[in-house]
Amino acid sequence: WIASLLLLISSFLILKEGGKLYIDETDPESPLRMYLATRNIVPLSFFSVFKTYWVEEEKSQRLASLPSPAELASQCGADKPIVVLVLGESARGDHFSVNGYGRKTNPQLEQVSHIINLGIARSFAVQTRNSLVGMLTNATEENRVPTMGSFIPLFNKHGFMTCFYSRQNKLGRSGHLTDALIGSSKDIRYFSSPTDQDLLKETEPLFKTYQHGLLLLLHTTGSHYDYRGNYTETFKVFAPDEYTPESMMEHRQNVINAYDNTIVKTDDFLAKLYAQLKDHDAIVVYVSDHGQLLGEHGRFLHAIGGTGTEYPEQKNIPFFFWYSDLFAEKHGDIVAALKHASTSGKIFTHDYLYHTVIALGGIRSKAVEPQLDITGLGTLD
């Protein structure tokens, strides 16, 4: 545990300056920032570091000890599809042109068929480490403490290959809370590759090996700050995109340009992922963990104000599905239900994700709450 603690401390980007320890506020999801940082860099002690570590460790242990949905009665159909859950990062739903944004940030997705868009949804929290709890357990906005662990063991129970591929730092923003949520996956990989697109080099052979009965979680870096460093020149559609942390308000339009370029990058990533799956029995869910402030209220980034009600842009997220022809052929009832939901006018939240993902795998379970299953097909009577 000592080695883990030392890695955790270094991942929080603590800087030595003038004989004192400081926290780098440029990482908005650092638990130390969440507990200790103000708008300016402030001194902090090793005691605070240890305290935060143990708080996180206790949370991790509580998550790991939650009852598993695999322990409850469940059934699974013979046709087991590929289910891919793309955990987007810091993406705002109202900056996607498929949601009516004035800039063409989704030139490829606008041309893709078989997308079912739930519109602009609302996140469980305003930082990754908390939102993942709302996305991967049965926690809801109303009942924020989960009573059931991740759905991954349930897919394991029914013979699915389960994988978690991430470009997020293992001990960084999400901390080891992530490990507690995805630790039952059969294949867990963390990548330090330059872009999200590099994940596609890993998914292509995976889809050739497992042509059905696969649950894959892809945790991308998406639109996380620093925006300009989060995409290549290929996706520099909106310019100028130069700014510094100190000049973000002065160069707000440049910041927005850079942010929108990250959405263009995500557009390309998803289109290529869909292309890899077009001949498979597959469905892809894309949803972001939280949104982002882009100068509204004089603020930037996220993880500001606790619940996010004061700055709602932080909870503004995209939420949509893509399905293949073969999936529609074999699971037409799921497709019909999702299409119906997309025209309901309802504002969807992370509350629905847990129960709906189970149903997408053709699994019916006592763990599924019918009012939170968008398909209406995952409940076991």
Where is each model-derived feature located?
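Active-site-proximal alpha/beta segments of enzymes that process anionic O-linked groups
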Residues: 12-246, 316, 349-380
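Histidine-centered active-site microenvironments of extracellular/periplasmic hydrolases
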Residues: 100-104, 282, 287-331, 368-370
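Membrane-interfacial entry segments at the cytosolic side of transmembrane helices
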Residues: 1-7
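Extracellular glycan-modifying ectodomains
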Residues: 9, 223, 292
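Metal-dependent active-site segment of extracytoplasmic phospho-/sulfohydrolases and closely related
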Residues: 84, 262-303, 354-358
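A long, amphipathic alpha-helix that forms part
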Residues: 67-74, 201, 241-284, 321, ...
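Flexible internal linker/loop segments at domain or repeat junctions
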Residues: 233-253, 301, 327-337
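A short beta-strand-to-alpha-helix junction
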Residues: 143-147, 253-264, 307-315, 328-357, ...
